[in-house]
């Protein structure tokens, strides 16, 4: 069989040309620019072949993915690598190894939104509002909340070094990580008729724990409730909805509105007559905590007491990708029953009262907010 070299070469050129045209059109569509493909090639060549030190292809590709989601300019939308994705799943399950601290980001950088009671960070003396300037000697100036959380978590028994800035002073902490199974619900009777429930996070198991402890307090004579959501960073909307069924009569809990304007209304379905209620909040109360507080305030079901909340009024979902990675992306904003959007604003309490510095929330001896809640419920 005789091959015509020119015919073979021409066929190859047609296939290659067709491939280039398809790629060019694809990147034109993806980038919105006719020059999308060459722009990518120039950037990739500069990073992989010209940059002063060699960089792996995997690092460059991960950077592209993180940059893609980061370009949304919304702090809660991030591409999660394998470690970050694992950390996220552990956080919502309520079980992980770390120091028991929830992080956030403000105009000064990375900071502690809330410190979980009786966990390593709490015992070491880290306080809500502390800015974390270094983790294991590495600056936090250019890392995301998810990156920082992943670095702080690790094997139980290992030590993480944190450099903290507090009121202009730099402090150093060496904290031993522990396996943390979060007791997300704690309760007790404050008086013969007033119960107290503290929720530290709305995790997968929180609703069941809340139900058990709520019914136990009822059996002890609870007729009114102090619900403590201070330093609660939020969690699962499904858990929030279940808990609302114990403290709110039938009605709107929250409305979630997506980019297309579609509205999903979540409702509470509790007793027709609500139990007298005071909800404690502070700057560390975010997301699901604000859903509860906002609904109670709008529907006049109780009194919100404390300081202005964090102001996270958005809903995220996680899309798993291959290789145990994923994308956490903000899909909607939530509206309180009176159609308030609190993202970036927070909820202003009905009764504003701050804790003195150095007082741990839920300490009934020194906690003036709990004392004020009791005063409100007993009048």
Regions found by a protein language model. Give the residues of each.
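Conserved functional hotspot residues or short segments at active or partner-binding sites
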Residues: 71, 342, 361-364, 368-379
């Amino acid at each position: 069989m005789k091959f015509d070299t020119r015919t073979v070469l021409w066929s190859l050129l047609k296939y290659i040309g067709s491939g280039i045209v398809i790629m060019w059109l694809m990147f034109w569509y993806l980038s919105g620019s006719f020059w999308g493909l060459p722009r990518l090639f120039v950037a990739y060549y500069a990073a992989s072949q010209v940059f002063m030190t060699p960089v792996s292809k995997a690092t460059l590709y991960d950077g592209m993915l993180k940059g893609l989601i980061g370009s949304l300019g919304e702090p809660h939308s991030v591409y999660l690598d394998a470690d970050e994705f694992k950390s996220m799943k552990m956080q919502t399950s309520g079980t992980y190894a770390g120091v028991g601290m929830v992080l956030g980001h403000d105009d000064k950088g990375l900071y502690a939104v809330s410190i979980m009671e009786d966990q390593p960070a709490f015992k070491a003396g880290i306080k809500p509002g502390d800015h974390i300037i270094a983790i294991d000697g590495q600056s936090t100036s250019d890392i995301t909340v998810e990156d920082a959380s992943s670095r702080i978590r690790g094997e139980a028994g290992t030590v993480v070094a944190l450099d903290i800035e507090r009121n202009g002073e730099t402090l150093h902490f060496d904290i031993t990580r522990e396996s943390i199974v979060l007791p997300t619900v704690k309760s007790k009777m404050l008086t013969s008729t007033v119960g107290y429930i503290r929720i530290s996070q709305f995790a997968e198991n929180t609703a069941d724990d809340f139900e058990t402890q709520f019914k136990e307090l009822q059996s002890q004579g609870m007729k009114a409730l102090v619900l403590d959501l201070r330093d609660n960073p939020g969690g699962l909307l499904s858990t929030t909805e279940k808990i609302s069924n114990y403290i709110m009569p039938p009605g709107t809990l929250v409305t979630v509105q997506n980019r297309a304007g579609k509205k999903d209304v979540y409702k509470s379905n509790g007793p027709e007559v609500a139990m007298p209620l005071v909800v404690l909040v502070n700057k560390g109360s975010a997301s699901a905590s604000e859903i509860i507080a906002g609904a109670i305030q709008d529907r006049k079901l109780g009194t919100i007491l404390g300081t202005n909340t964090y102001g996270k009024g958005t809903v995220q979902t996680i899309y798993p990708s291959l290789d145990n990675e994923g994308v956490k992306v903000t899909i909607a904003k939530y509206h309180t029953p009176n159609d308030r959007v609190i993202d970036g604003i927070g909820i202003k309490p009905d009764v504003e009262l701050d804790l003195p510095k150095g007082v741990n929330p839920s300490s009934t001896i020194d906690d003036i907010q709990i004392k004020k809640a009791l005063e409100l419920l007993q009048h």
